[in-house]
Amino acid sequence: MRILIENVSVFQEGDILNNKNILIENDIIKEISEDKNFEKIDYVIEGKNKIALPGLVNTHTHLAMTLFRGFADDLPLKEWLEEKIWPQEAKLTAEDVYWGSLLGICEMIKGGTIAFADMYFFMDEVAKAVSESGVKASLSVGMIGVSGNENEILNRGVNFAQNWHNAENGRIKVMLAPHAPYTCPPSFLEKVINKAVEMNLSIHTHLSETYLEVENIKNIYGLTPVRLMDRIGLFNVPVLAAHCVFVDDEEIEILSEKGVGVAHNPQSNLKLASGVAPVKKMVEKRVKIGLGTDGPASNNNLDLWEEIRLVATLHKGVEKDPVCIPAKEALNMATKNGMEILGFENSGIIKEGYKADLILVNINKPHFYPRHNLISHLVYSALSSDVDTVIVDGKVLMEKRELKILDEEKIMFEAEKRAFDLIKKR
């Protein structure tokens, strides 16, 4: 299949290239040039008044929690979890997770997110939804080490990895996911580390999300979560650490030296009153940072454009520094950095020889005029509804805002029904 995107502007490694033509051959970007005289083109997409940029990457979410969107808001975290979310999650079925995941994938595609990292339950159903939809994902079975036999818990994650890692021609990756230091004792974490080394897998975990978590871990082990994880060797394998809100300068050095990828979830951290991660210091120490939404019950959407704008504005205010996290840095966090953290090589950049993983943003709208600086407009003005076309591995998943593979109406109907049936269930 040879696709030609004509007359398009291209965001390429920090610059905007105007009036280009992108030739896609199968799943690869074959050529970016001003030449239009290509032979044997199967499909043409008009790119006038559009910008092509790498598809967005959500580095941390719990996708099927779409079913709980708006169910419990404006509550303290402990009450939110113990009285609202956990009792409902205990009633989830595999089919609930399947439809909740498809709803989340619909939302993400419509907003230009083409890859995500997910940690939840019934992950075979999430993998099935990813497989059917055409997007990319790094999936993990959330493992609570204190909830039973450690070997049985670990085997759930291992079996899932054996079945799904590198499935769908590499579109699906698997990480092992010990939930967090406060739910996974060192004895369990050491088993996870050994298995990750044996299977050549990365690890996805929550780390230093709240002040209470950090203080509790210090009281139990005499170390902060980051120092504890460093001591037991977690960072000797590739790690995706979600949140890292409460980390000091020395811990940031550890994250940098060990190459830990951090999923920064600014909106969820604010909504749950967790705090604000020291992202400026992390960037200065060259910690690789991606952006995440966290679960849609604590955000409450899967809109990476909101996270892009927030990371570029929030830290300016917190640091009282108007040049902190410039627009290009924010876009890189949401694209190139995210793909690298999730383990998708040869993606995250629009460049010849790279995977054809890209989106087209319609800039022929009032909030993109005047066009003084289109990179700034993408960060400070763009909306998820501006995304016109989504292409993953050379396959068109959405064009002119119409989903090409998923049945949006059916998915919304099924997810809505299951969400309310779940709440009624005793």
From Swiss-Prot:
EC number of this enzyme: 3.5.4.28, 3.5.4.31
Question: Cofactor comment in the record?
Answer: Binds 1 zinc ion per subunit.
* Matches recorded under CDD domains: ATZ_TRZ_like (cd01298)
Q: Which HAMAP family does the entry link to?
A: MTA_SAH_deamin
- Function recorded in the entry: Catalyzes the deamination of 5-methylthioadenosine and S-adenosyl-L-homocysteine into 5-methylthioinosine and S-inosyl-L-homocysteine, respectively. Is also able to deaminate adenosine.
Instruction: Give the family this protein belongs to, as stated in its UniProt record.
Output: Belongs to the metallo-dependent hydrolases superfamily. MTA/SAH deaminase family.
Q: Which PANTHER family match?
A: AMIDOHYDROLASE-RELATED DOMAIN-CONTAINING PROTEIN, AMINOHYDROLASE SSNA-RELATED
The protein's name is: 5-methylthioadenosine/S-adenosylhomocysteine deaminase
What gene name does this entry carry? mtaD
